Amino acid sequence: MSIIGVGIDVAEVERFGAALERTPALAGRLFLESELLLPGGERRGVASLAARFAAKEALAKALGAPAGLLWTDAEVWVEAGGRPRLRVTGTVAARAAELGVASWHVSLSHDAGIASAVVIAEG
């Protein structure tokens, strides 16, 4: 396998949270319901959502940042052991198939008010 693309992105947690407050419908345009909630059904914190948004931005960059990708066609989920993963459908899956992406690697972090993510597309 070889690396097809790499993307990295950062998001300021406070600014991202303010955007979600200012525009309540934004969360539904960016995230699936499964991404907004913790396994117990509680709402996920802003830092965690900012990291997930950074992952979606990084994923778009790894795919060459084409127009027309839908944010909700990329889902950031976490394995039982805590490892973040990506699940792609629709517009994102189509672009990934076009490029020959067979697997994804994603790393999320948030500290000192900044959320970050790195995505590697491998094929």
UniProtKB/Swiss-Prot annotation:
UniProt cross-references to InterPro entries, sorted A to Z: 4-PPantetheinyl_Trfase_dom (IPR008278), 4-PPantetheinyl_Trfase_dom_sf (IPR037143), ACPS (IPR002582), Ppantetheine-prot_Trfase_dom (IPR004568)
Q: Which residues bind Mg(2+)?
A: 9, 57
The domain of life for this entry's organism is: Bacteria
Q: What is its main location?
A: cytoplasm
State any GO BP term from the record: fatty acid biosynthetic process
Indicate the secretion signal residues.
none
Q: What are its cofactors? A: Mg(2+)
What are the alphabetically sorted keywords of the record? Cytoplasm, Fatty acid biosynthesis, Fatty acid metabolism, Lipid biosynthesis, Lipid metabolism, Magnesium, Metal-binding, Transferase
Tell me the enzyme class. transferase
* Gene Ontology MF terms: holo-[acyl-carrier-protein] synthase activity; magnesium ion binding
| Gene Ontology cellular component terms for the protein in this record | cytoplasm
Q: Name one Pfam family in it.
A: ACPS
Localisation per UniProt entry: Cytoplasm
Reaction it catalyzes: apo-[ACP] + CoA = holo-[ACP] + adenosine 3',5'-bisphosphate + H(+)
Give its E.C. classification number.
Answer: 2.7.8.7
Described purpose of this protein according to its UniProt entry: Transfers the 4'-phosphopantetheine moiety from coenzyme A to a Ser of acyl-carrier-protein.
Its family remark reads: Belongs to the P-Pant transferase superfamily. AcpS family.
Descriptive protein name: Holo-[acyl-carrier-protein] synthase
From which lineage does this chain's organism come?
Answer: Bacteria, Bacillati, Actinomycetota, Actinomycetes, Kitasatosporales
